A protein has these predicted regions:
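Catalytic cores of soluble, metal-dependent hydrolases
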Residues: 19-22, 26-170
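Glycine-rich phosphate/diphosphate-binding loop of Rossmann-like nucleotide-binding domains
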Residues: 1-23
Length: 170
């Protein structure tokens, strides 16, 4: 599974987005991320690998990149996303890429990269180890009956973290 977080629609080739959709991959627009970074937590919670490209951060917050532009993630949102990535009980690798020290006039970009790493580590230390693996006995179960499709939607809520999971029918 692959998810791209923070693409800018007017800079992204529509054929690329169409290909991602055909491959059943996801891509979240920058506007969706900026209007509520917390909505990215379930996506990042399920991540095994996170690659964070500095070019996704707007130039006013991180100019140490040759492709820096006026729009992108702000530093606060980037740090929130890094923490969510660290909080994933599944994550095996988090990488921060495309910082260019030669373009970092006042070392502000390096400071932001350090903050991103700190937030990812803070997320790792905040992991709850509550991924439902085998037994769901500890979890609160919620069943939503969808009469229109003759299907139940089942949610499980962790008593440890108050995080939710949804059962996906086979």
């Amino acid at each position: 599974d692959y998810t791209n977080i923070g693409h800018q629609g007017y800079l992204t080739d529509p054929d690329t987005l169409e290909l991602l959709e055909k491959m059943q991959f996801k891509s979240e627009r920058l506007g969706n991320v900026m209007s509520g970074a917390h909505r990215m937590e379930p996506i990042l919670r399920d991540a095994d690998l996170v690659s964070f490209d500095a070019s996704s951060i707007r130039a006013s917050d991180h100019a140490a990149h040759s492709e820096a532009g006026p729009n992108g993630l702000d530093a606060v949102t980037a740090c929130q996303l890094a923490r969510y990535a660290g909080m994933s009980d599944r994550v095996k690798s988090i990488g921060f890429f495309e910082h260019n020290p030669d373009l970092d006039q006042r070392n502000l970009g390096a400071q932001l990269m350090a903050q991103l790493i700190w937030h990812a580590l803070d997320g790792i230390y905040a992991q709850k180890a509550d991924i439902p693996k085998c037994s769901l006995d500890e979890y609160t179960k919620y069943v939503i009956d969808l009469d229109e499709v003759n299907q139940d939607v089942i949610f499980h809520k962790s008593p440890r973290s108050d995080r939710w999971w949804m059962e996906v029918p086979a």
